[in-house]
């Protein structure tokens, strides 16, 4: 048996959320991959991998097919967890219900759990059955607004074989509550209580990345007080998540539309945290209002 530990990634999540693209991405990263492996076969397969010693990076798509799914997977994860020769993580792919419905309509495929024929019924049942597994997942990726290329990059950033297994990265994202919470957010902070630049005509069409907007947001006493409290709160939290083995922590800052206040806060937070941590900064809804106006 090989003494080298096996790096195992179990890919799961909502049907239509991008598991096929994900498993192709792992193959490009040098992982040995298998799509749609029945949960019951996973332990025997891992035994064969260990005994051969030929593959130390493995990614498996474990698909949802029945109500027995979580019971089977939970039992398997318990066994894997006891195996000191395997390091494993769960990648859970998710997307909003509306986006999943749109993808099914585009491909004209039926949902595997939609016994009544309605895609939404299948999505609702699958989301309920997968909820416990999502809670166990170390990596949750919301693919709602991701192109296949962007999803591949996300997976490469999180699972590239060149990266250390102990690496820890922060994702700081701004968003608008009116467009929904980011599904992959670990920590969510609400800045809607701050004065809104939207009501300043000269600032309305700008974003929190513009200096005059950022200055307006941060000039208020409550803004600076909240920001300093936020930094103090995160100081002990981040090392704790790192110690527990979490590879990616997503911090989401939200305001009403995701254009001004949350963008200014997220940008400043990313810059400050970047002095001590690896940080990726993104602004999900920064241009959403402008795009909506242009389409109307």
UniProtKB/Swiss-Prot annotation:
GO terms assigned for molecular function: ATP binding; GTP binding
Residues given in the record as ATP binding sites: 13-20
Alphabetically ordered keywords of this record: ATP-binding, GTP-binding, Nucleotide-binding
Annotated Pfam families: PapZ_C, RapZ-like_N
InterPro entries attached to this UniProt entry: P-loop_NTPase, RapZ-like, RapZ-like_N, RapZ_C
Disulfide bridge partners, by residue number: none
Binding site for GTP: 63-66
Family: Belongs to the RapZ-like family.
Stored NCBIfam families: PRK05416.1
HAMAP family noted in UniProt: RapZ_like (MF_00636)
Function in brief: Displays ATPase and GTPase activities.
This protein's name: Nucleotide-binding protein SMU_1306c
Organism from which the protein derives: Streptococcus mutans serotype c (strain ATCC 700610 / UA159)
Lineage: Bacteria, Bacillati, Bacillota, Bacilli, Lactobacillales
